[in-house]
Amino acid sequence: HIDGGLKNLPSEKQVVYSRFINPTKYVIRKHSEIRMKTFNKLNDKEDILIIGDSHSEDLVNAVFEANLNSKYEFSSYYISVNCGVLFVKNKIDREDSRIGCKKMSFYNEDLKKLINSADQVWIISSWRKQDLYYMEESLLNISNLNQNFKIFGTKSFGSISKSWYKRTNQDKWSTLVIKDSDIILFKELE
């Protein structure tokens, strides 16, 4: 995220693109522009509030690049992944004390008003295992303000890796292969 994806390009393209864009500024710019933006209730657009960590910055960029802003109006709110993107008042064990998580909390009266006024609330995070403990309470608290919300997270393809595909015959690719560590995790999530 920090380099705006440039590191994934061949080195010659990195040099060219870096002369035209500042990747770090690109990633956060649009999210910052619409942060805590009040919705214009006089237009015909559906109002969507996007709340989250750096993944919300990526989602904001994606919706604008897809020109969804022609149909929807967007506002955003940033919460550090180290604070936990959770609508729970007391989660000290989940917060990084060096960041000042109370300032980025869901417990912000202006944010509550924005959640209430949105047609949809999209919450996105790089969820951590300790977030599971708070998830039920968090979802209940959000639904008390706005029942039309969607939760987004990171992807997980389990324990199958690129090397597994290289060494495994194609006819076995549809066979379920799960490591013991994945089975334990699935049982913990139940």
Report each predicted region and the residues it spans.
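Extracellular/periplasmic envelope-modification machinery, especially enzymes
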Residues: 1-190
